[in-house]
Curated annotation (Swiss-Prot):
Superkingdom of the organism of origin: Bacteria
Gene Ontology MF terms: acetylglucosaminyltransferase activity; D-inositol-3-phosphate glycosyltransferase activity; magnesium ion binding
InterPro entries from the UniProt entry: Glyco_trans_1, Glyco_trans_4-like_N, Mycothiol_biosynthesis_MshA
Name of the protein: D-inositol 3-phosphate glycosyltransferase
Catalytic activity: 1D-myo-inositol 3-phosphate + UDP-N-acetyl-alpha-D-glucosamine = 1D-myo-inositol 2-acetamido-2-deoxy-alpha-D-glucopyranoside 3-phosphate + UDP + H(+)
Amino acid sequence: MAARRRPRSAVPRRVATLSVHTSPLDQPGAGDAGGMNVYVVEVSRRLAERGIAVDVFTRAVSSDLPPVVEMSPGVTVRHVSAGPFEGLGKEELPAQLCAFTAAVLREEAQHEPGHYDVVHSHYWLSGQVGWLARDRWSVPLIHTAHTLAKVKNAALAVGDRPEPRARVIGEEQVVAEADRLVANTADEARQLVDHYGADPRRTLVVPPGVDLDRFTPGDRTAARRRLGVAEDAVVLLFVGRIQPLKAPDLLLEAAARMLADDPALRDRLQVHVVGAPSGTGLEAPRQLEQLAAGLGIADLLRFLPPVHVELLAEHYRAADVAVVPSHNESFGLVALEAQACGTPVVAAAVGGLRTAVRDGVSGVLVEGRDPADYAAAIRAVLARRELLSAGARRHAGAFSWERTVDSLVAAYTAAAEEMAAASQRAVPGTLLRPAWALGGVRALGAQVAR
């Protein structure tokens, strides 16, 4: 007989957040850490501030990591041992999902039934784990994809590998089973419906936010002084992981075109790249250095490692323009952070960047991949920088993590109420399971049986 569960409130008391492949404790801008890490950190902190406890489950990548870390009051990061600590690429993680899921279920089994009220999974790997946890705990699964394989494969960069069929199938399963699908933008919501057959009634748009207390306008001259940048320099800034998808090479080609059109810029133009290698293909700083040398702009290129948020804000303030030339972005938090600091953005007119940047008001969106078009857009921003800077601040001010969390809590509550109502009408039947778990569910259930 199943254990008796405590009565649930529709408003959650505790959320199990799943982030299998990357930890909220990792430094964004390196390896697999990026905007999703920022999202998990900011949302978790603000949920905790509202009295909703959060446990973040992530795969341990070192034996030195403590099993449990209090990230902030009310937010606990739980490092799960699942497979070798080191040497596993993201594409190898599906084989570790059974072990990861077993550990998550064991943790919940140590508590009174009904310990978690909601599961919120991030990325498709976590969604597969969340699907099984949802069925076992009888709680709603909220899923945020962050990126979608079908969309990424339609916009592959040179040197990048297509996402495997297994991921596509896994995403389709999670989309079919999640109680709510959270899309960053209306474009992403349409992609979920059109490419994955998502139920529009369960798909909601919740834009990410920006920390408006940390990313603020400031004195550009003072920021440059602190960073050792000449006051009269023209600084083009790229922030993010150095990988084909992010296309830092396109920024270098645009800078070379600017110099070809105006050689007098050579003494002032600088290209700052803040980030570290990730992914495949054109990923190493050395390769970007070789490209810069071939373009004749090696002396303009400056690499900086990923930095803490306070110093990152200084880099945004010191820049004339932030450039986000990605092949695709589900949103583009970097663009929003730059604008919050008063720095206008030149970005690709793709995906969520069409929402993150307001064309002609907070920056310029560029159609296509022609470096000449990017060079022209950068020049246009430089010519109107003060006006666009004011527009950037106003635009970013409309996005806050508080609004994001307002919408998420409403989604959690609505999904819980819907599940409670459905349970009154339920007819016993067979639950589907994730494909990777078929054949292993009985053993997994035995490991976590109460």
